[in-house]
Design a protein with these regions (language model features):
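A short helix->loop->beta-strand "cap" motif at the edges of active sites that frequently abuts
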Residues: 9-14
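Structural beta-sheet core signal
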Residues: 16-18
């Protein structure tokens, strides 16, 4: 909220994107073992944040749903062609993500907003 307030004070609009599914991802930071691994409990946090992003309480000026990136056969995961590790997008995934961005996202904020 504080970052959004600072941005708004400078005339910058804030857009939030839906946090994409990440089932299948495991991070092994610095070879110390699996320090982050997908679980239903962690995924519930993603869903909770996505719900907040869409709520009236969220300070964002816009919300970008990314549902088409989810695997229709496993909505907790990305489309297999869009990722190799479960979270980072392949070039095909990046193109699909870019196609979901609204054209007006880069328009300057007007005084009425």
């Amino acid at each position: 909220r504080a970052l959004a307030d600072m941005a708004h004070a400078q005339g910058v609009r804030i857009w939030f994107c839906e946090l994409t599914p990440w089932k299948g991802y495991t991070r092994n930071l610095f070879g110390r073992g699996d320090d982050i691994q997908w679980s239903p409990e962690l995924d519930a946090l993603r869903l909770e944040l996505n719900a907040w992003f869409q709520s009236a309480d969220c300070p964002a000026d816009g919300y970008i749903p990314l549902g088409p990136l989810a695997d229709p056969n496993d909505p907790d995961a990305l489309v297999p062609a869009y990722t190799t590790d479960g979270v980072h997008h392949t070039p095909a995934g990046q193109r699909a993500l870019a196609a979901l961005m609204p054209e007006n996202i880069f328009e300057p904020q007007t005084q009425e907003e």
